[in-house]
Amino acid sequence: MSRKIRKIEKHFKVFCEGDTEYHYIDEMKRQRKFAISLKPVNMKGGGYSNFLEHLSTDGNTNCLAKFIIIDGDRAINVEGEKDNLRELLEFCNSQNKSGRIPHIVVVNYPDFEYVACLHIPKYKGQNVTQYIINELHYRNLDEFKTDKGVYTVLNTRGNSTEIMLDALHKENCFVIHECKIKKNEYEMKVNMIWNWEKLGRRGSNINEFFDVITSF
């Protein structure tokens, strides 16, 4: 009797800075069907150097690409973090140039909570903390950050990921990636560009994450 050939499952790894991002991605992968599975990893803070340390030893088996989702405000508000961010970007860029597993860095500025507000059609740049409490009916920001159902909250009652994506502007992005995808061959080449003059502008390139995961 012939041996059954095991199908190799490719996946994307998604390294999330904290609980909010992790819960968002984890719930999204359960609700939406993607051709390539998502494997979120909760880094639980630790700054940019924590990402770099983890990525430098992380395995690549069956991994199609790695996404690194970080807040940009640390680079401005925490001493020494700008240099750590530079090292992280240079490491990811070297991985992309070498033809290894693509590393795509998503920088949310100032943070993911701002991106969360963009899911709400009425949001016009108000204070993020107060807006989340008032509009999404949380008692405080910590309750929002630890809510495992945050993806559902941000995609019901008129709120949606699509509204958030429409609100983003490429000219405000600190980092962007040019991705060339060969869908049938499960291959992707990435060119990464960042501009320090744009660090501090409200925005995000999280649209690139959605563009890639829906391209396969």
Each PLM stretch: what is its role?
Residues 38-48:
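Short beta->alpha junction loops
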Residues 2-9, 22-40, 54-67, 72-216:
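C-terminal accessory helical subdomains adjacent to catalytic cores in phosphodiester-
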